[in-house]
């Protein structure tokens, strides 16, 4: 995940008190067009339009004040922040990926670099236009829903106008697809610098598991809505970036990077107990007696208010997160035992709903 995408200074975004409906822009990878016609029509004409419309009507954000120009991928994890912009060391990677999709050149910022000591910071000149066109012609993973405008050597990228979130969509039978009965999965790939909000993400449809039967449509649509929300904010990889109602971080930031501390083993940023807290029950009743049991709860203000009201329990610390299912399920969904058919639990249940609890979490991001 790439952070510190520069769009506007933080003080400008914080002062913009009126939120606007979320605007999502969709870009297809070539793999989507290679699907059989019935599956392409399902995605293009029904599933994605309805899922995107649902979240655009349900969520509001501080309006993005200009085009989204995504950061280029650096060869290493180390970057320098200069003037609110991330700078790579000496060079940028030739390709910047978002999930299975190569981000188009005209969606990217220039290549900002510094030397290994953080000095001599500058914009690295792009490859000659002819070379870039040759690279694009050879790339089988580019987007082709419209032709990219030609870029001169000096011209800045156009970025993505009139949008708050860019969703790159692919349809590739990946290893993750083959692990189980996975219809689709999604995640964010870049966050803006001012408030850490995700501004780009990817969604991959698994062709082998994508059903076009009418009876399966509600299930597929619910799954895609669920996955898009992971990219928009409901994700353990974003917990450490949540902010309070004044736009201040809920997790302390490192002075050298401006980001929360990184868990090197899990490769995710560590959140504070103002976001997710480990709770221990000393007398957890089971058949035949009591045991000690620990679990993780979301303890942000609106979530606490909603979960206490839901269970009519004024002492409840927060909303419990799933503790089973391994990577991709545990800690990034609501606990199924408690929240049953809530759409953001880890397994699909008929008649799933997005409850006030999930919307409270999104408000607390």
Where are these regions (language model features)?
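Extracellular zinc-dependent metalloprotease catalytic-domain scaffold
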Residues: 1-222, 231-365
